A protein has these predicted regions:
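An acidic/histidine-cluster motif and surrounding catalytic segment
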Residues: 1-101, 111-135
């Protein structure tokens, strides 16, 4: 099963234009041949910070975290910290909505196996982000 996307919202959180964000995630899944269901959770800074500490040992807020599960028909989860996205959007010369788009693509690419820890990987991932965002 390819490209099944579920957008979920922690209490008090929301995302503008959810159908467009879901469609964008499906485009990445199709382009990268990702199989299975993906849950994208729009959540608080506190939720992302707790998961970042638990799974990465980093006690700080980040914008997006991806967890690949690869079990049955479930590809993984993406957690997007809404407040962090709003704060950092101006740094990237983005609107809040466009920053969410960037984070959806970024999280999806991580689920597809892409990373940005090394210079070459970072360049490839950025090029793919740009490709899907221009789509």
């Amino acid at each position: 099963m390819a490209g099944q996307i579920a957008l979920l919202y922690e209490e008090g959180q929301k995302a503008p234009r959810p159908l467009e964000l879901s469609k964008l995630a499906k485009t990445v899944a199709k382009g990268e041949k990702l199989q299975g269901r993906v849950e994208i959770v729009f959540c608080s800074d506190e939720t992302v910070r707790a998961r970042n500490k638990e799974y990465r040992g980093l006690d700080k807020v980040t914008d997006v975290l991806s967890f690949g599960w690869e079990e049955d028909d479930f590809a993984g989860e993406i957690f997007i910290a809404n407040p962090q996205a709003k704060r950092q959007a101006p740094r990237w010369n983005n609107t809040y909505y466009n920053e969410l788009r960037r984070l959806v693509v970024h999280g999806m690419l991580h689920l597809c196996g892409h990373d940005h820890m090394k210079v070459g990987e970072r360049k490839t991932m950025r090029e793919k982000e740009d490709l899907y965002l221009k789509g």
